[in-house]
Each structure stands twice: as structure tokens, then as C-alpha cells.
Amino acid sequence: MKTRRIMAVVLAALMMLSIIPVAFAEEISSISADAALSVRMDDAWAAIELAEAEALADNLPASDVINAVYTAALNNENVDADSFSDFTADGFFFTVNGMHCAYNYRLRNKIEANVTEEGSVTFNASNGKVVEMRDATSPNVLLVGPYYGGYDPTFTDQYRREATSIAEATGGTLTILAGHDATGPAIAAAFPDKGAVIYDSHGIASGTSSYLCLTTNQGITNEDYSNGWAVRSGNEAFIDGRYIENHITSALDNPFVWMAICEGMKLSGRGTTGYALLRAGCGAVYGYSQSVTFVGDYKFEETFWNVIKEEGTIAEAYATMVDVWGPVDPYGDAWPIVMSPVDDFPANPDQAQTVYCDWTLFGESEEPIALEGYTLSANEANIAVGETVTVKFNREPEDANLYDII
């Protein structure tokens, strides 16, 4: 009997061992396939970066460096031969086994690599101030600065000061994701519990979307690249609004997203980033139709945010900004564009826009006061073609606001 029991236990164990490979076969296969994609991606970029390094060592001009990189990519077996697109003076886009990639000479070779890492920081700017929020349900502010810390010295402290002043006005905290700490996952994780989000970075449009440029590809997956909501650029990466939409893990607080990046609202991008951010739970999104100048954007943002900090609406802030500086970058050809639930992506973003969004960051809520009665200055009017008639609507009480006029 003892022998039989032992044999039974052994047989059961063997049966369990035979089941284990079946249970994990699909998962192992998936991991192996993903690892294989990573190898192909890394091999392709190794060849591209070798060609770039050799061209730079020969002191070739930018156009020749780009051509050398293009030739290397074209001849690499891992690069999809028919995938090259969006050729510009700075580079081009392509795919590796369907995963989106980009080579941009300017971003790769005009950016300082040897800098003191700055990292991220969160601090309370409220000084004990308590403010009643309106459309944004959080007083906190997020500033994303991938090139902060010296990666690109053309980025100043303008948005540090602005973001700090917004947090001081709302009585909230300010979180700054700087340099390599501005990873895709970190940005998505920081979106919840924010009333205002500011991108201060480079931007680029490709295919049918517009992207925020990062100085690191840390945490971005092959799935992200395959879906096109992330683009690999060597050790760097770009992400669009769909990346945020698909990586946030909790509900957003209806924030306003200010994108101080180039091409965030470019026509070819079709508003993909803006629509994705709205679907994710943002209240409104601001960006530019073309490459914007630093000085032009700074003038726009200061005027715009001053109105917002005075409890104005986005429509009021936009109108004031345009009245002061005009409807286009005073030093370039970028048009400021707002997307919101009542402001669709324009058919032509390279022209003046009328903004209707009444989103307000904070301010005292209007107490609802019921309409008890009303009178009209005229009960009827005969109006001929081309004529107008004024009929006054007198409320009882005069400050009643709880009613609809149909």
C-alpha cells in the first residue's frame, strides 16, 4: 500500500509538471516575441547610430549626416522598407517591424548631453492659501520640462516662474518633471490630481499625430511604439496624447493642458493629441499649428495666464491674448489653437480661431438663485426683413440665474 501511495504521488507530480508548460506556454511565447522585437529594434538603432557617428567623425554637414543615416536605415533588414515618411531638413520617420521610429538630427546633435541631472521636484506653493476651484477640481500644477537642466540651454526659467505663480494663485502644489525624470510613465502617472498641466519642450508632428519630445525612452514599450502613440528616437522618445490616455491609472481632475511645444496643433496631426487628452478627462488643450518661437510663446502665455489667474475663462484669456499680440506668433507663423468640448480641431489651424471654451481654473462659484417671475417689455413684435426689435427680459429677482431661455 505504501508503495502504491508513493507511485500515485509521483504520477500526480509528473502530471502537474506536464501541465505547467501548457499553462505558461502562451505567456512565455509572448515574452519571447516581445524580446525578439526589442532585439530587432536595438539592432536597427545600432546600425543607424554607427552610420551617424562615422559621418559626424568625418565632419560632414547635417544634410550628409542625415543621408548617411537614411542609407543605413534603408539597408537594414529590420527596418520596414516602405515605411519612410515625413522627410524634413532635420530627418525622417520610419518603422522597425511596425514600431514607430524617427531620426532627427537637430534634436540628437544640437542638444547638450553632458549635463548635471536635475530630476523632479514637488513643492507646496500655497503659503496656506485656500482657493475655491471651479472647472478644474484640483489646485495642483504639473510642469513637464524634458530639456531642463542644460539639455537645451534655450529653455529658460519662464515656465518655472509661470507654473509657480499658478500654484500660488490656486493654493496648490507644483510638480516639475525635469530632464530624464520626465519619462513617459512618470508624466502619465503625474496627470491625476492636477488642475493645470504645462508642457515646456520640443514638439514634432508625424503621420496623423503630434508628439511631445522627451530626452529618454525609459519605460516606453514595444506595444507603445507599435500603436504609434510613442516614437523611438535612439535613446530618446516622443509621446502623444494617446499615450497619456492609455497609461493614466485614475480619473483626471478636468485639467487645462498648455502645450508650449512646436506643431502640437499642426494640420497633419488632425488634433489626435488634443482629442485623446480630452477623452482622457482634460478640460481643454492649447497648442500651436507650426513651430513657435520662444519669445512669441512667452508673450502669449504671460497674457493668457494673467487672465486665467484673475478668474477669467479660456475664451476670455484667448481673446485678450489675441487683442494684445495678434492671432499669430509675432515672430513666426505659428497660430495658437484651443481644443475643448465646444472647440473642435479647426479645419485649418493656420488661421484665426474663435474660442468658446468657458473653462475657469478657480474662483467663487455663482450661487444658484431661482427665477420667481419675469416680464417682457413687449408680448409680441412684427418684424420686417432687415429690421431688429429689442425685447427686454426683466427677472424677478434681478439676480436670478437658475433658468433656461428657449
Annotate each PLM feature:
Residues L37-L56, D64, Y70-A73, G119-S210, ...:
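A domain-level signal for caspase-like cysteine endopeptidase catalytic cores
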Residues N75-L142, K266:
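Structured catalytic cores of large enzymes
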Residues L11, M15-I19:
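Hydrophobic core
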Residues I19-S30:
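Sec-dependent signal peptide cleavage junction
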Residues F256-P368:
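Active-site-proximal C-terminal subdomain of hydrolase catalytic domains
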Residues A205-G287:
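Cysteine protease catalytic core and zymogen-processing segment of caspase-like enzymes
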Residues E366-E398:
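Short S/T/G/P-enriched beta-strand
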Residues P397-I405:
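Extracellular acidic loop/turn motifs
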